[in-house]
């Protein structure tokens, strides 16, 4: 599996959080696509 994106933390700037959630969604898509 690809490495899980790092959680930037509660006090991260909004663009940092947005990038994290985008990466996380992409990561989940990769994993679910591989599994099924």
UniProtKB/Swiss-Prot annotation:
<dbReference type="GO" id="GO:0005184">
    <property type="term" value="F:neuropeptide hormone activity"/>
</dbReference>
<keyword id="KW-0964">Secreted</keyword>
<keyword id="KW-0372">Hormone</keyword>
<dbReference type="InterPro" id="IPR020392">
    <property type="entry name" value="Pancreatic_hormone-like_CS"/>
</dbReference>
<protein>
    <recommendedName>
        <fullName>Peptide YY-like</fullName>
    </recommendedName>
</protein>
<dbReference type="GO" id="GO:0007631">
    <property type="term" value="P:feeding behavior"/>
</dbReference>
<dbReference type="GO" id="GO:0005615">
    <property type="term" value="C:extracellular space"/>
</dbReference>
<dbReference type="InterPro" id="IPR001955">
    <property type="entry name" value="Pancreatic_hormone-like"/>
</dbReference>
<dbReference type="GO" id="GO:0031841">
    <property type="term" value="F:neuropeptide Y receptor binding"/>
</dbReference>
<keyword id="KW-0027">Amidation</keyword>
<comment type="similarity">
    <text>Belongs to the NPY family.</text>
</comment>
<dbReference type="GO" id="GO:0007218">
    <property type="term" value="P:neuropeptide signaling pathway"/>
</dbReference>
<feature type="modified residue" description="Tyrosine amide">
    <location>
        <position position="36"/>
    </location>
</feature>
<dbReference type="Pfam" id="PF00159">
    <property type="entry name" value="Hormone_3"/>
</dbReference>
